C-alpha cells in the first residue's frame, strides 16, 4: 500500500513546495501506467492550475470526478476552474449539485455560499449557507471570515460583531479574526473596544495598511487626534496606494476623496449620533467643532461638515469660515475651462442639481422650468444624478429646452459640456448637499454663477457670484462671501399640489380623536435639543396633546422618547408616522392641528406642505439662513404673526393656539386663504422674479462690472432692479 501511494505523496510534496512543473511531469508519467487513478488526475489538475493552465486543469478535474464521483476535492476543483474561465452559470449549477450530493460537508457549503454571493449577489442565500456550514463546523474559518465581511457590508453591525467574537474564540491567534472584530465594533460606535481588537490584530502581525487606517479612525473617534495622525502616517508608509484607494472608495460618485483628517473624522462619526438624536456627547462634539474652525492649519475641508453645520448652533461667521475652507480646497484642485461668450439672443439659463429625480427639489423646480418666458429665456437642466425612471425626472426633462445628464462623466467633462452651451447664468441647486459636485462650479463654466434653494447658507466660494435670497432670509450680510440678489417677497417657491388623498382618519395613524396633534415632520438631522425642549414645554402645558413625528432613514424616535421621559413627558405621547406615497403624506397632514418648527434648521418645503393643507406653522427666526427659511415663507404669506424671536415666545404662541380653539381655527382659515394669495404658491410670479434677477446679473456681467448686491424687488427704474455698487 505504501508503494502504491508513493507517487501521490511525492506529487503532493512537490506541489506544496511550489514545484508544479516537476509534479506535472511525475503525474503524467505515473498516469501512463495508472490511467484510471482518480487521485492522480486530481493532483494533475492542481499542478496544471498552479502552472497557469486552467483549461487543462479543468479537464483533469473533470476526469477525476468522473472516475470517482465521491472525490469532492476534484469536483470542487472543477467548479473553481469554471469560475476562472468565466463560465459562471456552469460553475453555479455544478456547485449547487455538490451541495445536494454532500449536504454534510461544511467546507463545501461555505464554498457554494461564496460563489453564490460573488456570482449572483445573493446575500440572503449566502448567509443561509454559511449558517448551515457553521451549524456543522462552528469554527470553520472561511465561513466565519466571509460571513462577517458580508454582514459588515450589509450594515448589520451587531450581527457582524457577534460573528467576529465567535471567530476570535475559535481562532484566538488569527489576526484577521481580531481585525474583523475591530471593524465591527468601529462600525457600532464602540471605539475603545474597537481599538483594543485592532491592537490585538496588529500584535499578531504587521497587518495591512488599511488596518492602521481603521486604527486611526478609532483613535480619531476617541478624540486622540495626534495618535490618529500617527496611525494614518504609518498606514501611508506601508502602502500609500492602498490608503489612497481606500479614500477614493469613501467618495460618493464623483465627489473628491475625503482627507484623513482626525478632527473631521471625529466630527463626521459624532454627527451620525446627532442624526439619531443621541445628544449624550453633544457638548464635546460642539467644542471640537468650534476648535477645528480656528486651528492653525485652517478649518476642516470636508464638505459634508458644511451640510452638518446647518443643524448646529454655530454663528454665521463660524459657518463662513467652514465654507471658505471647503471652497478654497475645491478651487485649488481644478483648472477653469475655456468658454465662449454667450450669444446675443435669448438669455441662456442653466440649472445644475444632484436631485433631478424622485426628490423634493425636482418636485419644486420642474413647474418653474416650464413657467419661464420662452420669448426671452432658454432653459438648460443639468442632472448630476442618473435617471431613476420616476415621473419627476421625466417632468424635469420635459420642462427644460435642453436636458443634459452629466452623472456619468467626470467633473471636467461636465464643466466643458456646460461651457459648450454658452450660458448667461448657471444656477446651482445643490450647494454642499449630498451628490453635489462643487468642482464643476469651480471650473467656471458660466460667466455668472449663483446659488439658490438647495443650501441655505453661504458657499464661501469665489466661484459663486450671487446667492439668491430675500431680506428675511439674510440676517447677517457680512457673513456671506457671495453678493446677495434679493428676490421680491421670498426666496422660495412651492407649486400647488393637486394629488392629495381625501378624507384620511386619525385612527388610521393611531392618533387620538380627542387630542391636539402637534406635527413635527422633520428629518432628525434638523431636530436640536433646544427645539425639542420647547416642544416638551408645549406638551406639558397642553396635557391632551401628542407630538407626531415621521419615520426616517435612521432610528431616532427611541432616543427622543427617552429625552421626553427625562423632561417629564410620557414617552407614549410621541407618535410616529411611517413613510407613504406623496398623496397620502399630504392628506395625513390635514389631521394635525399645529406644526412645530425646529430652531436651527427650519422646515421649508415641509412647512409649505403643512400650510397647503391648512396647518399653521409656528417657527422661530434665528441668526442664520437655515434658521430663517420658514420665517421668509410665513412673512411672504401674510402670516408673520406665526414667527417668533425667542424660545419662550415660541412656546407661548404654540400653547396659546393649542389652548384657544377659536384662535386656532381662525388661524387655520387664514392659512388656507394664503394658498391663493401668497407669492410662495405663485409659480409664474416666482419665474418672473427670477427672470428679473437673471437680467440684472447678466447686465452687470456684460458691462464688465463685478458682482454687487442687487434688490430685484425694489425697482430703481422701469424694469431695472436696484443695485448697490
Model-derived regions: residue spans:
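Alpha-helical solenoid repeat scaffolds of the TPR/TPR-like class and their adjacent stem/linker regions
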Residues: 1-511, 523, 533, 562-569, ...
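Short hydrophobic "strand-cap" motifs at the C-terminus of beta-strands
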Residues: 352, 521-522, 550, 577
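Glycosyltransferase donor-sugar binding loop
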Residues: 383-388, 546-559
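Catalytic cores of eukaryotic secretory-pathway lumenal/extracellular enzymes that build
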Residues: 574, 579-580
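A short structural motif in glycosyltransferase catalytic domains
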Residues: 598-600
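Short glycine/serine-rich donor-binding loops of glycosyltransferases
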Residues: 606-607, 630
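Short alpha-helix at the nucleotide-sugar/activated-sugar donor binding site of glycosyltransferases
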Residues: 610-612, 635
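Short acidic/histidine- and often glycine-rich active-site loop of Leloir-type glycosyltransferases
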Residues: 627-638, 643
